[in-house]
Amino acid sequence: MSWPNRITLLRLLLVPVFILLVLSAAESAAYRYAALGLAVALGVCDAADGILARRTGAVTRIGSILDPLADKALMISAIVLLSRKGILSADHPALHLPYWVSVTIVSRDLFILVGTGIIFLLVSVFQALPSAVGKAATVVQFIMIAAMLASPDLLRWFPSATWYGLYGIWGMTVLLGVISWLGYLRTGSKLLSAGGH
């Protein structure tokens, strides 16, 4: 197995660890900081394995499957967990990801996963090449997760600015998510049409 694929597999295996840390975040800030650190590390690894694969010519079919799977596993897990009220801090029970954000992003990610599977079954084509908007949406989602994990501390120091910042990044996440969703829908339709469906 190539090093990029090993990094991707490690990212996937660390998702349950991230889940456990977030579930314990309200008990101790240490767990929340650990979850934040792990989220940042996974984001860096996500960029690193792609760059490494391209520079070393180690782009493989299994890697093209595992990479988006690792992304979606982390994103969906994080967004579902962060939608729970009081998940991050007992001092801020109302702090959670709004449902209009979580429903939009989780629906988009599930649509991409299911759509990719359907296209593969119908036309035997597996295409996991994210668009520029799709990549931007993923980056903003990582930033949103990090901001949410850091927000209990930020709310103590800059309450108004933190709430404005959170709503801004929530709006940007949804906007990019919807735009990329439409882009993937268009790409999927073209692939099905080319395959005679």
Where are these regions (language model features)?
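Alpha-helical transmembrane bundles and membrane-interface segments of multipass inner-membrane proteins
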Residues: 1-197
